[in-house]
Amino acid sequence: MLSSIPHGGGTSAEIEARRGISKEAARLIKAQTSWRRLDLLLAGNIKPGDVYATFTWDNAHYPKDRRDALRQWSLFRRKLTAKRRRCGKDLIAFWSLQRGDLGNRWHIHCVCNCGGETYEELEKLWGRGTVKPYPVERDKDGGFYTSIARYMARFRPEKLGQRAWSYTRNVRRPEKDSFFVDDNATLSVPEGCIILDRAERKTSFGEYQFIKYEIPNF
């Protein structure tokens, strides 16, 4: 992404316009919205063939409240982590505890690197209800993760301080690189990459460009 830097001088309207352009570009650079951040994390940690699953509770194990639901989920993650470690693998997982569909009952959406486990094994380890798993596949727009990220981040937390989604500590974070370019520079992606999204805005006071792309077989 390229972003102009506001310079001094000009009328108050011009200064405010330049600030607006820079702020808009910064919002895209930082990907501060919840689903965009999750989208980046999924892209760096989850691959096609991994699992996206919905975990539900039966009546016998249904949680008393949000805290109890997260406690039960933590116990399940410990069992799954231990199982994978016995096979020499680490668990990488992202999850969102939600309520609002499925009869307004608590349920958990999860994306994890458990493509090697059978679906029957996941349901046996869960042991509190049903597991509906699906293999992670390519989105219709060319990406793998955007639709999953949007869905998992769609519910707002019920209270201040609660997270819409969480993840294991061992996930890889996006790497950032910033540098100055000439005013007439044009963004281009590496050869062979697939462009998933592109945005550009230009006014008399500033401009930015944005390209989201996928590196095949990365």
For each predicted feature, which ranges?
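Conserved, short, structured surface segments that act as functional micro-motifs
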Residues: 107
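Right-hand nucleic-acid polymerase module
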Residues: 1-104, 114-218
